[in-house]
A protein has these predicted regions:
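Glycine-rich N-terminal segment of FAD-binding domains in flavoprotein oxidoreductases
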Residues: 3-42, 318, 353
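A glycine- and small-aliphatic-rich helix-loop capping segment at beta-alpha/alpha-beta transitions
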Residues: 9, 27-43, 71-75, 99-109, ...
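FAD-binding subdomain of flavoenzyme oxidoreductases
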Residues: 44-199, 399
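Activity-critical C-terminal alpha-helical subdomain
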Residues: 123, 371-407
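C-terminal substrate-recognition/cap domain of FAD-linked oxidoreductases
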Residues: 163, 174, 182-348, 352, ...
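Alpha-helix capping/hinge segments and adjacent helical runs
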Residues: 354-366, 391, 395-399
Length: 407
């Protein structure tokens, strides 16, 4: 691989790395032509070290296979994107993927000790180390994470493992009022419950996913808004205490029902994106992130402005960490009206989110999709430093060109 990259650099040939192809931002599309580098054959789990609590894997291993391998050895790999069945770990690192467990364990960069990278000029470098802390200059492994294949080709990764909490409960709090559903979240976070997941589905998603999965007994199908909460602990007494707290908090906030969330409820959450095809073959998914204390206001804002647009607006969210997924459905709109209205809608949402300290993407990345918006909704000084780094590491500008920003 490094020899191919040296040749590409010598002859100024663009190279785009394609991992699992699950990007929702066009990150793996070769917009400038050239070579597309497929990673699926780099699929070996090299080592699991139980004493050191780490795994070393190649970049083409499916995330779900890493999770299963760790679980079989009695450990947890905490990275858990909803596309785990099909995405690859290299792509997770390149986009700094999040997922359902990020509220407790953090995003992908929090699960990685080190990476092996082929640089744009064709050198093989190892960045990072299996250390809980270090103070030895720039943290270059973190620079690669979230760079979307523009600064280097990730070939291997050393991943952190966690002990598996033996006690777990999944709770479903159902609300009829979206404001009540949203306002309960800061109370949960302030109570010290430290949930593993806090997920939100508006009623259009409750009905849509239940229909898609043919789940006829979905609780409060007609008007329910779901807040799904997972709590994991290392003692049964602690779990009982936290579940009692959650029940009281949700009931006091106005929940019409508080029950156990079985696997069918999680299937609904995981199939939000797929369920959209029941009403529209064309849809667009967005991925803004805002400060956690602003998420209720942001969803209320989106619901309000959505009323004036001619397409359905559906919202699911990792509300525990401020990350919203807004899905717009084309349905029967003409191409021209769809494109014009979508652009206007996104401008309103991005402007609002940026004004309260938010950013364009929480876990999907910028890719080619939001390249233009990156100029408007990112601080100028931040962009300038990014461009300087890109030019220094990739002087020929051949690695995944046309992504994140223009040079």
């Amino acid at each position: 691989m490094y020899k191919r990259q040296k040749l590409a650099n010598t002859y100024d040939v663009p190279v785009t790395v394609r991992s699992g192809g699950t990007s929702l931002a066009g990150g793996a599309i070769p917009v400038c032509g050239g070579i597309v580098l497929l990673m699926e054959r780099l699929n070996k789990i090299i080592e699991l070290n139980a004493e050191g609590m780490y795994m070393e894997v190649e970049a083409g291993v499916r995330t779900v296979d890493i999770q299963k391998y760790a679980n079989e050895a009695g450990f947890l790999y905490a990275g858990d994107p909803c596309s785990a069945e099909s995405c690859l770990i290299g792509g997770n690192i390149a986009t700094n993927a999040g997922g359902n467990k990020a509220v407790r364990y953090g995003v992908t960069r929090d699960q990685v000790y080190a990476v092996e990278v082929v640089t744009p000029t064709g050198e093989i470098v190892e960045l990072g180390a299996r250390l809980k802390k270090k103070s030895t200059g720039y943290c270059l492994e973190q620079l690669i994470m979230g760079s979307e294949g523009t600064l280097g080709i990730i070939t291997k990764a050393t991943l952190k493992l966690q002990p598996i909490p033996p006690y777990r409960f999944d709770l479903l709090a159902v609300f009829s009022d979206p404001e009540q559903a949203l306002d309960v979240v800061p109370k949960i976070m302030q109570a010290g419950i430290n949930p593993t997941s806090v997920e939100y589905m508006d009623n259009s998603y409750v009905r849509g996913t239940a229909d898609y999965l043919e789940f006829k007994g979905a609780p409060h199908y007609e008007n329910g808004i779901y807040v799904i909460i997972t709590v994991e602990t290392f003692s049964e007494d602690e779990l009982d205490l936290k579940m009692e707290q959650l029940d009281e908090l949700c009931s006091a906030a106005g929940a019409v029902d508080v029950l156990e969330a079985d696997e069918r409820i999680w299937d609904m959450r995981r199939n939000c994106q797929e369920s959209v095809r029941l009403i529209s073959l064309v849809s667009l998914t967005d991925d803004v992130v805002v400060p956690v204390n602003e998420i209720a206001g942001t969803i209320k804002f989106i619901m309000k402005i959505g009323e004036k647009y001619p397409f359905p607006v559906k919202i699911n969210a990792h509300i525990g960490d401020g990350n919203l997924h807004i899905v717009l459905c084309k349905c029967e709109l003409s191409d021209e009206e769809w494109e014009n209205k979508v652009e206007a809608f996104h401008k309103e949402v991005y402007t609002y989110a940026y004004s309260i300290g938010g950013r364009l993407a929480g876990e999907h990345g910028i890719g080619a999709k939001k390249l233009r918006e990156m100029e408007t909704y990112t601080p100028a000084g931040e962009l300038a430093i990014m461009r300087t780094i890109k030019a220094a590491m990739d002087p020929q500008l051949i690695l995944n060109p046309g992504k994140i920003f223009d040079l």
